[in-house]
Amino acid sequence: QAPPPVLIASVNTLRALVQEVPEMVEALAEKFWPGALTIVLPAQQSLVWDLGETHGTVAVRMPANRYALELLQETGPLAVSSANLTGQPAAVTVEQAHDMLGERVAVYLDDGPSVMGLASTIIDATGLVGPEDERRPVRVLRDGAISRAELRTVLGDLLEREPDTAPKPAP
């Protein structure tokens, strides 16, 4: 099971949670946040939350739901779980979430059916942190609501090639 993402209400909170916010991550946040993009970056050394086996990273997203944003402005960042069990489709309504998760969840917030019904796109942007000559492309860890084509409009060649379009090694 993947570590839970951390929901935030502002890019300023992102800066407090991660070691560095590369320029391209700023551009992604400006275009796709609030929204269905989860970005994995190296966590601040001072981040002591037990988020599971993260290998020193944190997955961060700014939700598009106004109630969630208001809550986050009051509470600060929150580590959250998806409204589904690993391998199961995402719940679109609070009833579906309750049927799937039951009493394992203490509080359900109901803002009506999810408009997208799609999971967030998760990208690994850890390769953008550090010296420029050591940078690696951004990897898509999970395809979701934001397509690779949309990501490419911001990242260009900094987005990894899709698996089926990568050049084949010469025999």
Language-model segments: which ranges?
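Active-site-adjacent structural elements in enzyme catalytic cores
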Residues: 1-171
